[in-house]
């Protein structure tokens, strides 16, 4: 089987992290985001993966080469000379996606969930039509494009309603699809939208179905959602009693859902959790309080600091008795001085912060 991952452009929503690494290589749960998807696709029998990119493919080539060998898949880059939206990249990769009659997966690189690729392929094969969209239920459908089914048909899609004022349903597009190669005949090689142009055309012909996603789902393309997605991912691991989580018997674990790389060092009298990820070679000092945060590789949090709702970037340092909260994101190699308070915002790479940041801001 084949798959195309829509990687896209500059990852501006996840800055300042994407100023250092392309978004697919930013670690989520201590592994590059793209690796979660490659691993799940390979487990479902996918042998050819296309990454549709228009930004820094050179950086990704060497990183992804080892995944090819590890998971026995072929990973190719389809490089856009101009952004082609969400449908144009399928046409650009037509030689691979359309090389045989087997269906192919399409997914957005920002989506984290329990990927149901095997079940999705079986469902798609069973109904025999042109396309299937994975949908997920949300509490506030008025913020999204909602999927509406045909009367008396649980899976055949009738239409899409963008940000409905009145309730028409609570299922939204989860950014994961499976398509027959015939869909490529509907797409022109130009900037075009699969959601606004291709899907309505397939719908009109009664050829589009939905598949309900079980479990968690999150688009982690911006910092607040990255943190929310981390909480959902850790909760999912906890339900499965995953060995990736630190046991609750560890003296520093407070509230559970804590992931610590084996190479990290944790000081005395720390309270860590719930929902914390600590990356490779991270150093956490004595008496530190961590909650709902991610500490990326080689970062350091010094004694008695408080870090909550924060992403601490690679090689960054948080000073003694400092306090970070309210969706603060430190880029690569940022230094927060002792006793400094940061109340949200983004701090770009290689900055040193010696004064309080009382109002969320972008510090360049």
Curated annotation (Swiss-Prot):
> What keywords would UniProt list here?
Cell cycle, Cytoplasm, GTP-binding, Nucleotide-binding, Nucleotidyltransferase, Transferase
Write down the EC number.
Answer: 2.7.7.13
Q: What class of enzyme is it?
A: transferase
Query: What single Pfam family name could you report for this chain, choosing any that match?
Result: GMPPB_C
- Predominantly, its location class is cytoplasm
CDD domains cross-referenced by the UniProt entry: LbH_M1P_guanylylT_C, M1P_guanylylT_B_like_N
The reply to whether Nucleotidyltransferase figures as a keyword in the UniProt entry is yes
Q: Name one GO biological process term.
A: cell wall mannoprotein biosynthetic process
Report which reactions are catalysed by this protein: alpha-D-mannose 1-phosphate + GTP + H(+) = GDP-alpha-D-mannose + diphosphate
Q: In which pathway does it act?
A: Nucleotide-sugar biosynthesis; GDP-alpha-D-mannose biosynthesis; GDP-alpha-D-mannose from alpha-D-mannose 1-phosphate (GTP route): step 1/1
Its subcellular locations are: Cytoplasm
Keyword NADP found? no
Q: List the disulfide bonds.
A: none
Q: Name one GO molecular function term.
A: mannose-1-phosphate guanylyltransferase (GTP) activity
**Protein family:** Belongs to the transferase hexapeptide repeat family.
Summarizing the function annotation, the protein's role is:
Involved in cell wall synthesis where it is required for glycosylation. Involved in cell cycle progression through cell-size checkpoint.
Protein's recorded name: Mannose-1-phosphate guanyltransferase
Which species is the source of this protein?
Answer: Aspergillus oryzae (strain ATCC 42149 / RIB 40) (Yellow koji mold)
């Amino acid at each position: 089987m084949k798959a195309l991952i829509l990687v896209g452009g500059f990852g501006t929503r996840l800055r300042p992290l994407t100023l250092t690494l392309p978004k697919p290589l930013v670690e989520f749960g201590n592994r590059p985001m793209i690796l979660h998807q490659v691993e799940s696709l390979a487990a479902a029998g996918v042998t050819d993966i296309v990454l549709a990119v228009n930004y820094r493919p050179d950086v990704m080539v060497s990183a992804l080469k080892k995944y090819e060998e590890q998971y026995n898949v072929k990973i190719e880059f389809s490089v856009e000379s101009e952004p082609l939206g969400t449908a144009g990249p399928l046409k650009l990769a037509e030689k691979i996606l359309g090389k045989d009659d087997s269906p192919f997966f399409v997914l957005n690189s920002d989506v984290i969930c329990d990927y149901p690729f095997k079940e999705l392929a079986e469902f798609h094969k069973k109904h025999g039509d042109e396309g299937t969209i994975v949908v997920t239920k949300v509490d506030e459908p008025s913020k999204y494009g909602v999927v509406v089914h045909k009367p008396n048909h649980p899976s055949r899609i009738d239409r899409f309603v963008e940000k409905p004022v009145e309730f028409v349903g609570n299922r939204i597009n989860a950014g994961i699809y499976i398509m027959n190669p015939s869909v490529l005949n509907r797409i022109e090689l130009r900037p075009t939208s699969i959601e606004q142009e291709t899907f309505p055309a397939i719908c009109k012909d009664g050829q589009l179905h939905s598949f309900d996603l079980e479990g968690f789902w999150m688009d982690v393309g911006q910092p607040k959602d990255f943190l929310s997605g981390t909480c959902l991912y850790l909760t999912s691991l906890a339900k499965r009693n995953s060995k990736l989580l630190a046991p609750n018997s560890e003296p520093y674990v407070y509230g559970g859902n804590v992931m610590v790389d084996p190479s990290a060092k944790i000081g005395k009298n720390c309270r860590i959790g719930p929902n914390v990820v600590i990356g490779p070679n991270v150093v956490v000092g004595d008496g530190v309080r961590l909650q709902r945060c991610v500490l990326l590789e080689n970062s350091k949090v010094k004694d008695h600091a408080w870090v909550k709702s924060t992403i601490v970037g690679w090689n960054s340092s948080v000073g003694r008795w400092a306090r970070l909260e309210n969706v603060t994101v430190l880029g690569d190699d940022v230094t927060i001085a002792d006793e400094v308070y940061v109340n949200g915002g983004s701090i770009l790479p290689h900055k040193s912060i010696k004064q309080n940041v009382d109002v969320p801001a972008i510090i360049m």
